[in-house]
Amino acid sequence: MPHTAVALRSFVTDMRYKIDHDFHIHSFISSCSHDPEQTSERILRYAEENGFSQICLTDHFWDESVEGASNWYSKQNYAHIAAALPLPKSDRVEFLFGAETEMNKNLVLGISKKRFDDFGFVVIPTTHLHMKLNISEEDGATPEGRAKVWVSRLDGLLDMDLPFGKIGIAHLSATCIAKEREDHLRVLELLPERELERLFAKAAEKGVGIELNRGDIEAAEGAEEIVMRPFKIAKYQGCKFYLGSDAHSTAALDAAVGRFDWAVSYLDLKETDKFHISK
């Protein structure tokens, strides 16, 4: 019996990370989606066709009770995204209602503590540095300034008193870190190794999910070591990972699973590396 138990534990530990979910998906309700076919029904079909057990709708959201929204975000309040409810049902897929909120340059988070109760999962990006809302003109002027902000924003988020068991940190290697690819890669190169180790040890302790984002994975082509470095360090520090297509269109949905598969192989992820949403 002891040998059987050891063998079973070894099997579970060595089991390849299963691609069975997508926790970052936008519908046409998000203002930056321009695909009328990107409906909840189409998203559910994507999940069923790929054998997923869980998905989450995460349209852009800024809580109307929190000051500091941009004009673009202020229109995407709770009533706006709740138009998606009720979500379609499936016997095979749990379809969660979530949101992608924002954090401005003053580290004001666009969701109140009370509002978390209305969502099954909340995606929080720290790398939307293409938005004036999130970075000063001075910091945004150089890759060095952007690298400093990359660190301080993630640090600031992790210092907050939040229900991290139902939060994912989105696209940490996103191309929106900088406009030009050369600058984007330079920012990622400038992130200090020790700071990354410290931040991801902190993230692991908090129990927050780290997103493997389809867009980040696409951006890794030809620059794998640079773009995937934060995730390699996150894995080493004990972080747990979830998958997010960040799809705003049906074409992006269709491309997601292949990208996820590449990232799982590149990072050699096992089931024990998987983030599970806690209520």
Sequence positions of predicted segments:
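Generic structural signal for hydrophobic
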Residues: 43-47, 114, 157-160, 203, ...
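A metal-dependent hydrolase metal-coordination microenvironment
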Residues: 16-152, 252-254
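Short, glycine/serine-rich, charged loops/turns that create anion-binding
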Residues: 62, 102, 173, 217, ...
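Short loop/turn motifs at secondary-structure junctions
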Residues: 51-53, 118, 163-168, 268-270
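Charged catalytic cores and adjacent phosphate/nucleic-acid-binding surfaces used
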Residues: 3-28, 184-279
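Domain-core and long-helix interface of multi-subunit machines
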Residues: 29-33, 124-130, 134-237
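Short, flexible, glycine/charge-rich loop motifs used to bind or transfer phosphoryl groups or to couple energy/partner
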Residues: 10-12, 85-86, 111-113, 157-160, ...
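Flexible glycine/acidic-rich beta-alpha junction loops that bind and position SAM and/or redox cofactors
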Residues: 65-67, 171-173, 177, 250-251, ...
